[in-house]
Amino acid sequence: MEKSCVSFYGDVNIGADISIDELRESVDAVIYAYGAGTDKRLGIPGEELKGSIAAAELVAWYCGNPDVHPDTDQPAGDRLMAADLQELITSSRHAVVVGVGNVALDVARILIKSVDQLSDTDMADEVLDCFSRNTVTDVHVLGRRGPAYTAFTTKELRELGQIADVDVIVDAADLELDPSSQAVVEQNKVAARNLVVLQEWAARPLSGASKRITFHFWSRPTMIIGDDRVTAVEIERTMIDSNGYVVGRGGGATLPADLVVRSVGYRGLPLVDIPFDDSTGRVPHAEGRVIRDGGVSPDEYVTGWIKRGPTGVIGTNKSDAVETVTSLLADVRDGAVKTHSRSGDLDRLLAQRGIRPLGMPAWHRIDAAELKLGASHGRLRTTLAHRGELLEAAEKEA
């Protein structure tokens, strides 16, 4: 980002400040890398009750996304999400997290930690203040398959067992492997390591800690119970049938719950005038080249989750980007991408509309402001979560 040949345009809304067609006319090629912006639903009764939320909403809030931390001059309706999340954190004892990926683990970890254990993070002040009043004592993590099929990494899993004053509870019976699970563990080193960690926890006596994280494998929610607000979750036991599908097998339980967080995957969203396959939640492509109107677009490319779906880690995104950039460079070499002298076209268009994009100097001023605020609190950094304070920091000279 610091190279002279790279320009950063922050605070520019594609589709509002500038259309896709105008952007394409201002540059030689466009790479779409805007990720998967929404979550997958559970599709069960009670999912709309107060207290049933998406992990994406909760993570955006505690990570300081300004879209979830509106300024006071924004319409009241835009503030409901943050206000509701804060109310849930400070009034819930029992939380149920549905999913067994790294996001689900992160949610469980954040919900169960004390504010002192979160004080070395870069959370915004108002988020830390909310967690100082956190009342959650029990987190239940549900996985519809067995431990061999979890999607988290061992490092993130093991950290849960190192949180002070927290017992991690695992039923040893859930860790018994059927032939298909055994095959997965034998072929997947991460799954094998995760199983060892879970077995250690299952064998470890409880310490009488004041908080608990309980894993429920082979379990899925069938109904969220409550009148105006979540009060419990019905779960059923599951198994994998002969066709490899997860099916119910009877039995189950009712878990007390004040908060239900679904973390069963993300899904891409369409942006105005960008090709989108609603059946997959992705931009259609061929080796990173966007498919538009049934053919390969001559100047549009795609990478990341909006290209392949919400899977993998940073390393996966790197190899994914290599494929896209390789296609772009090949097209430039072969003349499929027409290069023109367009220097300044985008700047002139934005200036004509009175739009002042934030460049890298502005980004550095925001960075400095967050470091300064963090230092004043004895922390490395404190996130600025409101758009107004971000823009103020961006404009402020050192």
Model-derived features with residue positions:
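Core beta-strand elements of the Rossmann-like FAD/NAD(P) dinucleotide-binding domain
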Residues: 22-29, 90-91, 246-258
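Dinucleotide-binding/catalytic capping subdomain of oxidoreductase cores
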Residues: 51, 105, 109-251, 326-328, ...
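Short hydrophobic core segments
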Residues: 26-35, 96-98, 255-265
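FAD-site-proximal beta/loop scaffold in flavoenzymes
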Residues: 51-69, 73, 77-84, 224, ...
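Feature captures the FAD/FMN-dependent oxidoreductase FAD-binding
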Residues: 1-49, 214-216, 222-235
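C-terminal catalytic lobe of FAD-dependent flavoproteins
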Residues: 183-219, 223-276, 354-398
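C-terminal, flexible cofactor-proximal segment of oxidoreductases
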Residues: 289-398
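Glycine-rich dinucleotide-binding loop and its adjacent helix/turn
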Residues: 39-133, 283-291
